[in-house]
């Protein structure tokens, strides 16, 4: 049994309870065999059915007790697995939020979604199957063979000799099955990530005319998963056949030896019949574990992966900031901040409320800097100061409550338009929601929906264009009205006409706020109070649009390159 299971809350208590129920069940199995043997022997010796009614009654009581314990164990384990699965999902999601979007992006969004949904369900199934059957395998065979030893030593010796052979064979097949299952799980993760990436990029693929050719890639990834699954199933069927074959062979061997000694008069019918009835019970727990082993492999892998994520070190513990709403007197400083090769030796200072543009070529470190400012990423080195308080990162409740993050692809929930807008402020009134929608330019969409703000959008309702989705994100920002805005390429996926349509709305939103806008589109820089130019992960230049043009440096090269592309 994996030691990792003992880290789950209540595991020791549930194992103790299962062990007690299994001991009662084992006693019922043995007495069931004893009383059945006694009844059959009595009938064989010519006793009347009436005289055997007490024995038959005891047999029925043992039979009911045995299966009653099975039902009780299943119910207890099911409830425990459901509770553990719910707690594990909560811990997993909390850890993902602590680690931030950067971690989810690195590991693959598809894999994280799969683990949170199917992975935890598979782990629950693993607990339901593994716990009671492993306890049974530890108790039932030992108790049965000891009882058989006092009935017939020869049968007990045969059973003891057969068990190691069966277990060794099961281990060998299990190792093969484990490799197959690992390959299948990796293929499944790859399929999940590929599916999510394909959905995200479907519009781009269609625009480029590559959607049909991409279907070949989808078929290839799906086919690899199918082959991995079928390969695992072949091993599962083979191991089930092998377990059944060796079990039947062992029981047949016991039966042959008992039959020969019955003929010779070396053993009485009662003990022989008891030993024969108990022989299949001796192997049954091992067979059940072997048959269900393959069904639990994905659950084991999912549990292992989830525990690896849960054990990921979080952000360094820091003294919480006592930051109220960001004001003109507040100040943020970054001194020598570095993150791997993405950004290095960043020195920046921001005070009060102003619009700050962050530009640079692809890979210059714009998104990394935004992640640092949002508290999504812990720098490898350097120091951050908020109003004179030094910190190693910005993952802090009071800081992040001041933030509102608008990504490149805002998520639209399968819900009403109003609830989507109220994402950051669920208790907002209908009047405030309507005002935010109007400020974001969503009045036409509200009027076109049959139920207005209560009309459904997203997967289960009306689909939105890229511009409309971005306006929903802006409406959230208007309603949330937080003093610090982080925008990471918010218009990169929009055509230039749509971008200019929502630009005025965004500029209205930027007023009286500290804004960090990372973008490739340089026309935004004309409206920025300060521009940070990144080059190779370092701050190359800082200034206004006109000041940077006069320097004729990196910024000027970016402007000329973009003008050249347009020309």
UniProtKB/Swiss-Prot annotation:
Binding residues for ATP: 360-367
NCBIfam families xrefs: CydD
Protein name according to UniProt: Glutathione/L-cysteine transport system ATP-binding/permease protein CydC
Its membrane topology: Multi-pass membrane protein
Span of the signal peptide: none
Keyword list, A-Z: Amino-acid transport, ATP-binding, Cell membrane, Membrane, Nucleotide-binding, Translocase, Transmembrane, Transmembrane helix, Transport
Swiss-Prot/TrEMBL catalytic activity: L-cysteine(in) + ATP + H2O = L-cysteine(out) + ADP + phosphate + H(+); glutathione(in) + ATP + H2O = glutathione(out) + ADP + phosphate + H(+)
GO annotation, cellular component aspect: plasma membrane
């Amino acid at each position: 049994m994996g030691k990792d299971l003992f880290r789950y809350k209540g595991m020791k208590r549930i194992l103790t309870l299962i062990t007690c129920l299994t001991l009662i069940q084992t006693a019922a199995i043995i007495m069931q065999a004893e009383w059945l043997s006694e009844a059959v022997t009595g009938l064989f010796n010519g006793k009347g059915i009436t005289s055997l009614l007490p024995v038959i009654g005891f047999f029925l009581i043992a039979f009911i007790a045995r299966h009653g314990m099975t039902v009780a164990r299943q119910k207890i384990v099911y409830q425990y697995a459901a509770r553990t699965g719910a707690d594990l999902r909560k811990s997993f999601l909390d850890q993902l939020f602590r680690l931030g979007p950067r971690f989810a992006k690195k590991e693959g969004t598809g894999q994280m979604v799969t683990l949170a949904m199917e992975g935890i369900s598979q782990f629950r199934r693993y607990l339901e199957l593994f716990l009671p059957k492993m306890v049974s395998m530890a108790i039932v065979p030992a108790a049965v063979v000891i009882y058989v030893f006092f009935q017939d030593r020869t049968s007990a010796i045969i059973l003891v000799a057969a068990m190691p052979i069966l277990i060794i064979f099961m281990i060998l097949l299990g190792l093969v099955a484990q490799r197959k299952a690992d390959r299948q799980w990796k293929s499944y993760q790859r399929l999940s990530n590929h599916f999510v990436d394909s959905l995200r990029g479907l519009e781009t693929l269609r625009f480029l005319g590559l959607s049909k050719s991409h279907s070949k890639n989808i078929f290839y990834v799906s086919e690899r998963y199918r082959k991995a699954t079928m390969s695992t199933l072949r091993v599962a069927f083979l191991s089930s056949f092998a377990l059944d074959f060796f079990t039947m062979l062992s029981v047949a061997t016991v039966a042959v030896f008992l039959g020969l000694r019955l003929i010779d008069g070396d053993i009485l019918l009662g003990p022989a019949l008891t030993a024969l009835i108990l022989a299949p019970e001796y192997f049954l727990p091992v067979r059940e574990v072997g048959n269900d082993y393959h069904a639990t492999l994905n659950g084991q892998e999912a549990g292992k992966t989830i525990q690896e994520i849960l054990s990921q070190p979080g952000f360094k513990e820091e003294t919480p900031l006592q930051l109220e709403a960001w004001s003109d007197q507040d100040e943020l400083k970054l001194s020598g901040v570095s993150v791997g090769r993405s950004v290095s030796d960043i020195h920046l200072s921001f005070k009060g409320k102003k619009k700050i543009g962050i530009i640079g070529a692809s890979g210059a470190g714009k998104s990394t800097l935004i992640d640092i400012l949002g508290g999504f990423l812990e720098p490898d080195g350097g120091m951050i100061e908020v109003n004179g308080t030094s910190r190693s990162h910005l993952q802090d409740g009071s800081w992040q409550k001041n933030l509102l993050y608008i990504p490149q692809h805002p998520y639209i929930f399968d819900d009403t338009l109003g609830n989507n807008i109220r994402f950051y402020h669920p208790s907002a009134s209908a009047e405030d929601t309507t005002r935010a929608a109007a400020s974001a330019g969503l009045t036409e969409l509200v009027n076109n929906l049959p139920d207005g703000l209560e009309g459904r959008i997203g997967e289960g309702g009306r689909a939105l264009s890229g511009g409309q989705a971005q306006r929903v994100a802006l409406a959230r920002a208007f309603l949330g009205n937080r003093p610090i805005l982080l925008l990471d390429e918010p218009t990169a996926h929009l055509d230039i006409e749509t971008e200019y349509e929502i630009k005025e709305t965004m500029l209205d939103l930027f007023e009286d706020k500290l804004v960090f806008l990372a973008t490739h589109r340089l026309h935004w820089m004309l409206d920025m109070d300060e521009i940070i130019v990144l080059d190779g992960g370092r701050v190359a230049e800082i200034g206004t649009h006109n000041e940077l043009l006069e320097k004729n440096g990196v910024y000027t090269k970016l402007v000329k390159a973009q003008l050249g592309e347009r020309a």
